[in-house]
């Protein structure tokens, strides 16, 4: 059986631990086709179960729970163990993640807050009895699953892909029959700006009555953030280019397409009956590679919004007639949260400058490196500089690595930090630096503002249009390292004045990036699209 597991299932299986659940007696109720199910049940580590095709006469007093199976499915050898363990811990409805497709290339990650469309779930004996008493049909699996979703008092979603459906995933697997459906499309699920700020859309859509599903490629960090926000997540490596899962979009009441990379999907839905909100975060650099996929005209069902004037100008450079509204993302007030303190002892009490972003030409790490080198030695030694981001370009990484080796007591590099670490870093640093050559609205600069930290930004960033020079930040022009060095030198020599900018930085966050203004704007846009308001 192991050879038939998907890559995700194999990866998870290596980390699973065995739990003794043999005291829990289960029924597996599968009245339909069950060839694959029967074979996989033979490999179960949990052995105290019976496979039945009817419930009448099988529900003896010793049965603790019943796994309802509406269609043929393969289970991992640990499936019943996980289901039984959740039952022992007090759950009355237990579901799990699953993979779909012949090779298991599509994965469905579920959350306790989003449990419609179940095809397989474990019910406690008490919950099953209540569902059977309410059901109209005679032990119809889908009806029992629907009622269980309504009547359950303690749902539990096992975060393991225990099931493998050989067919492709469809809308009925992730949405309920009658709920309002919102599908969010993201070309990447990484700990970068666009996916991170996209998380904030989930609670807004849920507050408007939508069931929310996120579609993206393999998880590289923020998947759990979406789950915590109450969305289900579907991953597939080729989700942007493959039409296999676009059926989810045609069955939705709203599609939120994130970034210009989703142009192929927008093009497909353009002029259709599906309302599409296209949220642009993109810099100029990406447009030459995708312009040919952007519609030349937009149907009434497609509305475009952007995170500021820079992202707007980027789209207008190729489609000048498009109407684009402003939707500047909102970030929660992280300053009010509790998180572990990140160790910045390497700074030695000196003024700490931080930049966060992948090491690639567009992000300008070489400009920042050159500016640090241009500082007088006596000034440079009074500060510490931290680069955070993956090495996306060899030349840019070499520039940072060379600087670290030349000034090991002053310059530091971290490939990646977890979200709590980034928050703590922003709380403790003195200033953030964004040297990007092309950056619509850098998220880490906004995160700095939350903690009252001023920024030094390039004129080629969306933030540059919001910063007031010397009040809540600083601006330099022409990608000039010397200008940046001059701003750094002033900040290093005037730490008290830098710290005194705290209140103005907080004010800029509250005026431009607070969750309240973002929620109000997004709510209005969604209602205009879906309700005609």
Q: Where are each of the predicted segments found?
A:
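A short, well-ordered alpha-helix in the C-terminal region of glycosyltransferases
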Residues: 483, 490, 497-512, 518-524
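Conserved donor NDP-sugar-binding/catalytic core segment of glycosyltransferases
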Residues: 78-106
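Glycosyltransferase donor-sugar binding loop
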Residues: 214-220, 384-398
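A conserved mid-protein helix/loop that constitutes part of the nucleotide-sugar donor-binding site
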Residues: 195-203, 360-374
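Aromatic "clamp/platform" in nucleotide-sugar-dependent glycosyltransferases that forms part
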Residues: 437
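Nucleotide-activated donor-binding/catalytic signature segment of Leloir-type glycosyltransferases, i.e.
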Residues: 232, 398-417
């Amino acid at each position: 059986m192991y050879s038939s597991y998907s890559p995700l299932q194999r990866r998870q299986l290596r980390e699973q631990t065995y739990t003794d659940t043999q005291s829990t007696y289960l029924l597996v109720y599968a009245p339909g086709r069950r060839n694959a199910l029967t074979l996989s049940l033979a490999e179960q580590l949990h052995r105290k179960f019976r496979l039945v095709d009817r419930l009448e006469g099988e529900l003896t007093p010793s049965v603790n729970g019943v796994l309802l199976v509406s269609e043929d499915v393969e289970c991992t050898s640990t499936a019943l163990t996980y289901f039984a363990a959740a039952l022992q811990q007090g759950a009355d409805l237990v579901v799990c993640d699953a993979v779909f497709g012949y090779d298991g290339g599509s994965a469905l990650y579920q959350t306790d807050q989003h449990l419609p469309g179940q095809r397989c779930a474990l019910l406690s004996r008490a919950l099953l009895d209540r569902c059977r008493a309410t059901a109209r049909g005679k032990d119809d699996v889908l009806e029992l699953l629907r009622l269980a979703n309504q009547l359950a008092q303690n749902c539990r979603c096992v975060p393991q892909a225990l099931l493998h459906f050989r067919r492709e995933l469809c809308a009925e697997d992730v949405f309920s029959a009658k709920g309002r459906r919102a599908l969010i499309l993201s070309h990447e699920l990484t700990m970068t700006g666009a996916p991170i700020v996209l998380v904030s859309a989930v609670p807004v859509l849920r507050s408007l009555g939508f069931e929310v599903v996120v579609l993206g490629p393999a998880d590289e960090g923020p998947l759990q953030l979406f789950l915590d926000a109450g969305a289900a997540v579907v991953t597939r490596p080729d989700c942007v280019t493959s039409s296999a899962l676009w059926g989810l979009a045609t069955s939705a009441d709203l599609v939120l397409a994130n970034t210009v990379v989703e142009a192929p999907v927008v093009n497909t839905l353009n002029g259709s009956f599906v309302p599409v909100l296209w949220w642009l975060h993109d810099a100029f650099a990406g447009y030459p590679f995708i312009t040919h996929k952007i519609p030349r005209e937009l149907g009434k069902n497609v509305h475009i919004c952007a995170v500021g004037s820079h992202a707007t100008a980027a789209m207008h450079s190729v489609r000048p007639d498009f109407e684009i509204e402003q939707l500047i993302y909102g970030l929660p007030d992280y300053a009010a949260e509790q998180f572990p303190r990140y160790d910045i002892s390497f700074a030695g009490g000196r003024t700490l400058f931080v930049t966060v972003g992948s090491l690639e030409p567009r992000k300008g790490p070489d400009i920042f490196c050159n500016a640090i080198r241009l500082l007088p030695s006596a000034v440079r030694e009074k500060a510490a500089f931290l680069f955070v981001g993956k090495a996306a370009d060899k030349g840019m990484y070499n520039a940072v690595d060379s600087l670290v080796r030349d000034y090991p007591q002053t310059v530091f590099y971290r490939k990646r930090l977890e979200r709590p670490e980034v928050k703590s870093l922003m709380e403790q640093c003195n200033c953030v630096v964004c040297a990007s050559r092309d950056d619509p609205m850098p998220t880490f600069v906004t995160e700095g503002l939350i903690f009252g930290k001023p920024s030094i930004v390039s004129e080629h960033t969306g933030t540059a249009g919001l910063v007031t020079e010397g009040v809540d930040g600083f601006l330099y022009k022409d990608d000039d390292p010397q200008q940046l060095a001059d701003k750094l030198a002033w900040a290093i020599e005037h730490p008290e004045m830098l710290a005194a900018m705290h209140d103005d930085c907080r004010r800029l966050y509250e005026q431009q990036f607070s969750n309240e203004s973002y929620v109000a704007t997004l709510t209005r846009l969604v209602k205009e699209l879906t309700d005609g308001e």
